[in-house]
């Protein structure tokens, strides 16, 4: 039996990869979606399930888990071949076909490939305070799976970016007391998020750093804070939980081992106006791609997905019409024309 050949193989099952797979189904292509984790959703599912997403069109505010659930439901409309716990360990190209080798020992052939892996594997940026790592899971957290684990708790959040600011505001509605610790007086977050923070009941400890974290006899944590310019100017706070949100360190070691190596722009892939790399038929979307003016937002990646899919189709079927509009396609036996 001849090996099955896909029109498009999409590597990465985060929001951008999921939407690309849906749109590929909308264009009636044979598509496979490969995700290394056990579930779809990427960083939104793994790192920010409780975070409120504000910058996606059509959603005034949506929780990360709800957003991924909506994408999953949308994806079920078409027979996309979805394989989770599948890491692409090699990508080769021979003639007009790509061969994808997975950690499961399977070989997948595709006419085109769309990479939507984000910045790659990720791990939290650790706080550089002695002894804190021993307290992870005992009041110190790098991830939040369920915000209600902090109901009526006294909590401290270390960080000053979008995630830390949004988390502090969100948890202030359910925690007994919320303190945000940042090394600067100014926060590196969206302007409206900062305005919301300033109007909230969150206590701001700035410009401060954490000197030490110690476990108290009652199980709570004592945080010794110091002014960033004067270690003698200190104060202590007692909390139930410390959430460290210094961002994440990412790497693409797996991709670096591929036989196919498209041109890089720093640590991500350089693409042209159709999201294609210098390797014909290989496209990159989302945070893994770079072009002049690129912003790393979910909304941007979602917009790139249809462009990459349409360009991929033109690679293996130049005579095919497109790009396609959903309002002129067959959906559940109903045709609507936008004449």
Curated annotation (Swiss-Prot):
Transmembrane segments: none annotated. It catalyses: 2 reduced [2Fe-2S]-[ferredoxin] + NADP(+) + H(+) = 2 oxidized [2Fe-2S]-[ferredoxin] + NADPH. GO terms for molecular function: ferredoxin-NADP+ reductase activity; flavin adenine dinucleotide binding; NADP binding. It comes from the Bacteria. Its cofactor is FAD. FAD binds at residues 35, 43, 48, 88, 122, 287, 327. Keywords: FAD, Flavoprotein, NADP, Oxidoreductase. SUPFAM superfamilies: FAD/NAD(P)-binding domain (SSF51905). Its EC number is 1.18.1.2. Binds 1 FAD per subunit. It holds the Pfam family Pyr_redox_2. InterPro entries: FAD/NAD-bd_sf, FAD/NAD-binding_dom, Fd--NADP_Rdtase_type_2, Ferredoxin-NADP_redctase_2. The keyword Flavoprotein applies. Homodimer. Belongs to the ferredoxin--NADP reductase type 2 family. This is Ferredoxin--NADP reductase.
């Amino acid at each position: 039996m001849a090996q099955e050949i896909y029109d498009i193989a999409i590597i990465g099952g985060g929001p951008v990869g999921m939407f690309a797979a849906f749109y590929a189904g909308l264009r009636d292509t044979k598509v496979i979606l490969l995700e290394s984790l056990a579930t779809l959703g990427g960083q939104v599912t793994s790192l920010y399930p409780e975070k409120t997403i504000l910058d996606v069109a059509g959603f005034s505010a949506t929780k990360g888990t709800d957003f991924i659930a909506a994408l999953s439901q949308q994806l079920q409309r078409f027979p996309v071949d979805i394989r989770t716990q599948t890491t692409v360990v090699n990508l080769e190209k021979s003639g007009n076909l790509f061969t994808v080798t997975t950690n499961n020992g399977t070989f997948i052939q595709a006419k085109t490939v769309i990479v939507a892996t984000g910045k790659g594997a990720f791990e939290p940026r650790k706080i550089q305070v002695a002894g804190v790592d021993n307290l992870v899971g005992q009041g110190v957290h790098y991830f939040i799976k369920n915000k209600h684990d902090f109901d009526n708790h006294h909590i401290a959040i270390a960080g000053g970016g979008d995630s830390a600011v949004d988390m502090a505001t969100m948890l202030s509605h359910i925690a007994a007391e919320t303190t945000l610790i940042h090394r600067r007086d100014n926060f590196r977050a969206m302007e409206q998020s900062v305005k919301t923070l300033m109007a909230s009941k969150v206590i701001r400890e700035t410009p401060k750093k954490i000197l030490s974290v110690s476990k108290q006899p009652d199980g709570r944590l004592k945080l010794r804070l110091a002014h960033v310019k004067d270690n003698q100017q200190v104060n202590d706070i007692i909390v139930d939980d410390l959430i460290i949100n210094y961002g994440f360190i990412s790497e693409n070691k797996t991709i670096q081992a591929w036989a196919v190596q498209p041109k890089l722009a720093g640590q991500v892939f350089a693409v042209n106006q159709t999201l294609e790399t210098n390797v014909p038929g290989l496209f990159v979307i989302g945070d893994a791609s770079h072009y002049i003016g690129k912003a790393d937002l979910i909304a941007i990646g979602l917009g790139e997905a249809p462009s990459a899919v349409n360009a991929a189709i033109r690679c293996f079927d130049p005579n095919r019409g497109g790009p396609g509009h959903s309002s002129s396609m067959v959906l559940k036996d109903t045709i609507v024309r936008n004449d």
